[in-house]
Amino acid sequence: LPEESGSVSVEIVRQVSDETLAALTVLLPQLSASASSLTRERLETVVAAPGTELLIARTEGAIAGMLTLVTYTIPTGLRARIEDVVVDHSARGRGIGKALTATAIDIAEQRRARTVDLTSAPTKTAANQLYQNLGFTPRETTTYRITSTRPADSPNTRLAQQDESP
């Protein structure tokens, strides 16, 4: 990599630069209003995490989008998941999301992942159309989430309580 797609290039972030940190700091709020601010330390943790690839897309040299690909092994095999896909609002409709997602699929296939999953809000019409055009099919499933209320650096009391059971 980098992989070119028209005037869009996609690359895996191997080291955090000031440019990458600044661009992702602008992109993340466009993805989630509730996302906490991105620090260099957190971004370096993401980049260094085993099984996690942070992809960025450039157009005209500037970072205009990002995607995170996570691969993990479970008893049924190697799986992949696409998360945190966002293209800068000023650059949408130029094939950046397609280039990012296609590159992530290629990486997952090279690693022999059995499946690649992602979620997308039904209101994101263009994104859902893109994913279907790339071969994703909707699954009949319900996504559940529990949101932690404790700080990231606090001990996991639920597990600690289970360990202390008679």
Language-model region placement:
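Conserved N-terminal entry element of GNAT/NAT acetyltransferase domains
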Residues: L1-D18, T149-P166
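Conserved beta-strand in the GNAT
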Residues: I56, A62-T71, R81, V86
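Conserved GNAT-fold acetyl-CoA-binding loop/helix
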Residues: Q15-T45
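Conserved active-site alpha-helix within GNAT-family acetyltransferase domains
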Residues: K98, P122-E140, R145-I146
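A short helix-loop-beta-strand connector motif used in the catalytic cores of GNAT acetyltransferases and
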Residues: T45-I56, R81
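Conserved acetyl-CoA-binding loop-helix of GNAT-fold acetyltransferases
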Residues: V87, G93-D106, Q129-N133
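A conserved beta-turn-beta hairpin within the catalytic core of GNAT-like acetyltransferases
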Residues: Y72-I82, R92, R139
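Conserved GNAT acetyl-CoA-binding A-motif
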Residues: A108-S120
